Structures are given as structure tokens and as C-alpha cells.
């Protein structure tokens, strides 16, 4: 069976997929969405681990649509998974978006036909769907990063990945628990499970640089975040600040400010909680290594004072940082270091000597076995392109996406790829995923997507494809910004990019400049694209 009466196919029902379906449907396009989960919510539907919560304040992490505010009120300043699912249910009630999705079905392949100028999407249940446009909206949190550790199948107890946590109740109370990974989910797991476990052993690859969710125990708000009481104003601000969270950096370089004034400023930002210390700090935080070290030293002094165990203090908050502060998105914590400082919690450094194997009863490292009853993999997801690769996409002449990206990711605007006509990626590689509020990025991308598809329909364009030249131009624009920052000092390299001596760069110019690039493309007659009209192809 093949569904053929479609204009657009959208894969994924997280923020980007939901918004794309809603906006395109409002424009009158025939849209069909597919989602492997049973309901809306994307990563929030899957991430059921203890402590799962949003790491940004409530006015900004939502759809930028004032209509949704009419009968909705956020209860939590940093919404938990439960509140996020309640929010998606509210969105569904308002927008009736589930009517345009099929749930519980996975996409096994997607292929473009030059003969018909249409995409065919194959589903795992054997059905197919065809449409002019194909919109993968799977983000970069859809493919799990499972470490390859010998002996995993031998372990007698349960092994949980945070993104595949059982939705049924799982109790860690009174158990000996091992946690591998100290990224965002690791931080939340450690805070939640560490308080009730009999023993917890944390395997740390590198120290996790965190910021206090609340600047002090008595605080419940971030005073220095531009967070107006009027949520509509907050939504406007979210699209008019570079980070999408309303934070504005101080318009001074760090070392131009006297040390006493500097430390007073750091103290203000630190006590504000949230990401104020990072996003509302001095403007050269992630550009000047001396400025960056100055900020790190202040943070380290405050954080080290919370850890009484000397050995743990050096592991968790070293005096010399492993990487520049803020080039990785800081995790937010409430009492992480107090939990890790407890005697029943052990921290093992695996930066130089990896885990050897998993036995029936524990984890062997440094020649010794750590006994445990449950293992938690807080190891996150694959690289930003892993979700797209999992869809087995083939473009013009049957070229596989994996082959097109054999030397690393290439794109135009982080949304389109040469040899893959009529395919627009939402919230994928090479767009502002690192430093910007994701719903804000998605909002401007979907606005651009809708304008592109509407223009093509009006102009009789049946095929729109990014040029190979546009890849080079986008790479050059990214590099001009990237090379001025400290991000290149700790750039991640996949095996393929390492072989090609390329860094996995992303857009670090923020939301305002990115939106300008999208607008320039539209204003300059779809710059960077080649278009074929219906009369040129013979398709009527």
C-alpha cells in the first residue's frame, strides 16, 4: 500500500516536526507525519529517567505561538518531563496535530525519484508514502550512543540507557549502582539516584562543568535573565536575542575590567543562577583564552568549596580545566557536588584508562572489579548526523547520505544538501544547535521552510536543490565565526572527519545572524539553490 496524495512528509513529532506539520497544514498543504513513539513529544516522550527536566527557564522553552498561552500556565520554572508531556498534550488539544501523524511507526528508508521528482518513504510495516517534499525532523537525540564495552551481555543485573528508561517504575533504592557518563542526563541521574542508592560508582571521562540551577538555596528565579512577566513579550525577546533565551552579554572584554569589579560581576551572575554566568557574562568569554580561564577560576573556587573530599575535588573540579569553559553547553545542577561528596559515592577517572570489561557482577577498570547491581548508561546520543543517517536516505542517482557525507557533514544553511532535492532538514547539523534555545531555532527554520515550499508552488518549481557551491560558501561562513572562538580548541572529530583532517563545525554566530542568512537566501532569489520548473521537466 502506498500513500500518494501528499505534498509533504515529515518524520518526527518533537518540537520541529510538530511545528512544521502545523504551519504547512495551515497553508493548505497536504502533510503527513510519521513518529516511532506512540504520542507527540519527541525526546521528551522517550527520556523517562529520574530527574529528567528542561535546563532553561519556562518562558522560552515552548512554541512561539501566543495562542497556546490562552489557557496554559507553566507550574515549574525548569519544567520536568511530566510537565513537558502535559504541555505537548495541551498543544495537541489546541492544534489537533495528532490528526496529521501516524504513531508507532518507524521509517526504514527514504528515496528520491528523478523521474517523478517525488520522495518515497518506506515504513517498517511494509507500507510506503510519496510526496513532493521530505522533511526529516529527527533532531540529534534520536540515536543512542551505546559504549562498546566487552561483556555487556554477561551482566546479571539490568543495564539502562537514560534515553530508553522503562516507563514502568524502576527503583534504585538500596542498590549498588554504576553510572557511566557525566553529561546532562548523568548529572540529573546522579542527583536523583545518588540520594537513595546504597552505593554509587560514577565513571567519569572528563569533568562536567555545571552551573547552579538556582544561585542559592533560597532563590527560585533567575533575576538577570530578561524574563518579562508578560509571556508574549518573552516570546518576542526569545527571537530577538542571539541565544534565544533573553540573555545579553556584558558589552566589555573581561580583562578591561578591574579585578575587584570583575569578581563582583561574576558573583552577580553566579548568584543569578541558570545560564546567566555563561550567556550573560563578558562578551569575550568564549573568544579569549585568558578571559575564559579567569571565569573558570572564579567558578572553580566557588564549586571546589562545596566538596570536602580532596581526591574528589581534584577529579570533579580540577584547578586546570580540561577544556575551555562554556564551549560545551554547561549542565544545570542543584546539589550535584553535595551528592557526589557523600562517602557512599565513588568517582573513577576513565580519561586515560578505559573500562576493561563488564563481568557478571560488575565493571572491571584499572585491574579491579567494581561490584554493582544495576548499570546506568548516561552516554547520550550519537553525533548530530546520526539521526539522519538512521533513515537510510538516498538522493539523486541513488546516492546515499552516508556517502555524500563520507568526509564529514556538508550543507547549505544547515538545512539543505546538494544531490538531495526537495529535502529540508530541521534542527540538524550545522545550524545553531550548540548555543541557542532550540524552539527559537526551530521557529525561524520552519518560517523559512514554509516560505520556500509556498514560493515553489506559486512559481511552478517542482525541484529545488542546494548547489555544491553553496556547501563551500556555508562552510566558509561557519569557519569565519568558528575560528574566532575557542570552540576549535575542543572540536569533536568523528573517525571520518579525523581521517579527512576536518573539524565537525557548527554555526556559532547565534540566532540573529542565522536568521539573517535565511532571510538573505529568500531576498536573493533563493540564493544557493538551483530550481527546475514543471515545464522544464515535462511533468504536468
Curated annotation (Swiss-Prot):
Q: Which InterPro entries match?
A: FAD-binding_Monooxygenases, FAD/NAD-bd_sf, Flavin_mOase-like
Give the main EC class. oxidoreductase
Q: Does the keyword Oxidoreductase apply?
A: yes
What GO molecular function annotations does the UniProt record carry, in alphabetical order?
flavin adenine dinucleotide binding; N,N-dimethylaniline monooxygenase activity; NADP binding
Which pathway is it part of?
Alkaloid biosynthesis
* Presence of keyword NADP: yes
Q: What induces it?
A: Expression is induced in loline alkaloid-producing cultures as well as in planta.
Question: What does the note accompanying the cofactor annotation read?
Answer: Binds 1 FAD per subunit.
Query: At which residues is there a site annotated Transition state stabilizer?
Result: 329
Names of required cofactors: FAD
Q: In which residues is NADP(+) bound?
A: 53-55, 182-188, 205-206
State the practical use: Loline alkaloids show broad-spectrum anti-insect activity, and different lolines may have different biological activities. In vitro tests of NFL, NAL, NML, and semisynthetic loline derivatives with long carbon-chain acylations on the 1-amine have shown that many are effective against both fall armyworm larvae and European corn borer larvae, but the effects seem to differ depending on the modifications. N-Formylloline reduces the weight gain of fall armyworms by deterring feeding, and does not significantly affect corn borers.
Transmembrane regions listed in the UniProt entry: none
Record: residues binding FAD: 43-46, 55-58
Q: Could you say which EC number(s) this protein's record lists? A: 1.14.13.-
Relate the protein's function as given in its record: FAD-binding monooxygenase; part of the gene cluster that mediates the biosynthesis of loline alkaloids, potent insecticidal agents composed of a pyrrolizidine ring system and an uncommon ether bridge linking carbons 2 and 7. Lolines are structurally differentiated by the various modifications of the L-amino group and include norloline, loline, N-methylloline, N-acetylloline, N-acetylnorloline, and N-formylloline.
What name does UniProt use for this protein?
FAD-binding monooxygenase lolF1
Lineage in the entry?
A: Eukaryota, Fungi, Dikarya, Ascomycota, Pezizomycotina
